[in-house]
Amino acid sequence: MIQWFLKYRPRSLKDVENQDDAKKQLQEWIESWLNGNSNVKAVLLHGPPGVGKTVLAEALAHDYNFELLEMNASDSRKLQDIKSIAEKAAVYGSIFGTKGKLILLDEVDGINVREDTGAIQGILELIEKTKYPIIMTANDPWNPGLRELRNKAKMIELSKLGKYPLRRILKKICQAEKIICDDEALNYIIDSSEGDARYAINILQGIGEGYGKVTLNLVESLAKRKERELDPFETLRDIFWARYAWQAKNAATSAQIDYDMLIRWISENIPIQYDNIEDIWRAFDALSRASIFLKRAKSGDWDLLSYAYDMMSSGVAFAEPEKKKPNWKPKWKKYQFPSYIQLLSKSKDIRDTRDEIIKKLAIHSSFNKALNDTYPFFLLFYKKYDKHLNLNTKEKEYLSSISKS
């Protein structure tokens, strides 16, 4: 089952709704690039989720016969991943007989500038050296970590999708799928989606495929209004408590954490949610399949991302056969953070405490010299000299734990 927002996404710029100004700016930029007159090598498309940023880039590639070289920047974050894109663009010729290539770096605001060391610098180097136009997308372009990218790129804003354009999109899909949708139900979906076309189409598909029609009563009882900030605990509850596959999938695709982290959250809490060992096994089996699809999607076949979401959401949600019974009721459980996050947090806290001690030791030397030369010996004799360093309670506890180990 293919998702409708993928099945009916615009193929050409002329089919993209409500973004006339953005389309005009993008076409002017690509025309100047093709004519050799552009001083700007990259564009940063920005706007709320579901307004068509990625679709606009794909449609541009289609209309200008470019081979699209696509990478989700928030998933392939390391410097080496960025460089591999540059090498492919620079070295390998197109096998599709196209004019050239268009590089798409999706979700650059998903890059963690602290953890993903070198990723931003890698993109800057790619922009500097590229022989092909680059399009980046972001929900939040004003992230402080993206300042250098903003300076290098032409900023093009996509507006929130209006009610009338969204209505046209949904009406076309209803006609194509032969789904009867009441006007009141359509209005409710449009209001609930807050201009997010993907979210609105997911609701339409979930109810339309499940019931063959979309009425106000069905929408009001089954569809949640769009929430921009979904707590991970709320996302888990929506997945585990879902009565329908589309509800579980909506929860997963609306999560404010990336797919990898969502899998960690689900994995940690499967044994908490399910009591029956067979239910637990089925849930982990679905989650392992999600990981396989996700790995293949990241290698370039992004259509498989939909199947990854199916497995990590409805696959996990319906691991419990009891849910199919009409008298089934959800069980409230106290979910917990992934131990992976707790370990990272604890590890960082320990390193920070250690570094504070080393800074106190490095009064007359560099930090690295104190770390490599002074610190190892200090650990052997710290009890004699700790008073001279004005160590706080946390630092003393750290040293005490080191000596015991």
UniProtKB/Swiss-Prot annotation:
This is Replication factor C large subunit. One of its GO terms (biological process) is DNA replication. Heteropentamer composed of four small subunits (RfcS) and one large subunit (RfcL). Probably interacts with PCNA subunit PCNA3. Belongs to the activator 1 small subunits family. RfcL subfamily. It comes from the Archaea. It comes from Saccharolobus solfataricus (strain ATCC 35092 / DSM 1617 / JCM 11322 / P2) (Sulfolobus solfataricus). ATP binds at G47, P48, P49, G50, V51, G52, K53, T54. The gene is rfcL. The lineage of its organism: Archaea, Thermoproteota, Thermoprotei, Sulfolobales, Sulfolobaceae. InterPro entries: AAA+_ATPase (IPR003593), ATPase_AAA_core (IPR003959), P-loop_NTPase (IPR027417), Rep_factor-C_lsu (IPR023935), RFC_lid (IPR047854). Signal peptide: none annotated. Keywords: ATP-binding, DNA replication, Nucleotide-binding. Part of the RFC clamp loader complex which loads the PCNA sliding clamp onto DNA. The complex possesses DNA-dependent ATPase activity. One of its GO terms (molecular function) is ATP binding. SUPFAM superfamilies: P-loop containing nucleoside triphosphate hydrolases.
